[in-house]
C-alpha cells in the first residue's frame, strides 16, 4: 500500500509529464521585491528600502502582478512561488496572496521567517499555502 508521500509523488510526476507533453508551464516564481531585512552574503536579493527608492526602475504593482497571474493561470500554471527579497515586506503581499489562492494557485512562500507573527500565522491558517 502506498503512503501519502508516494501517492503525492506519483500525482506530481503525472502532472509534470502531462504538462511537459502539452508544453504547459506548471511552475512559476514571482520575485515581488528585492527588499530584504537581512543581508545574507550568499543571497543576491538583499536591497534595503533606501536602495530600492533610489533605483531607477519602478516596482511591479499589485494590479500588474494580478494581471500576470491571470495570464499564467489561463496558460495552466499551477504552482507559484512568492519570493523576494523578503516577500512579507512587499506592501500588498496579503492582497496578492489572497487573490492567488482564490485563483486556484498552489502557493509557496520563500521567506527568512523573521516577519511571521501571530497575524501572519492566522492568515496562513485561514488560507493555507
Regions found by a protein language model. Name each.
Residues 2-127:
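Conserved alpha-helical substructure of the radical SAM core
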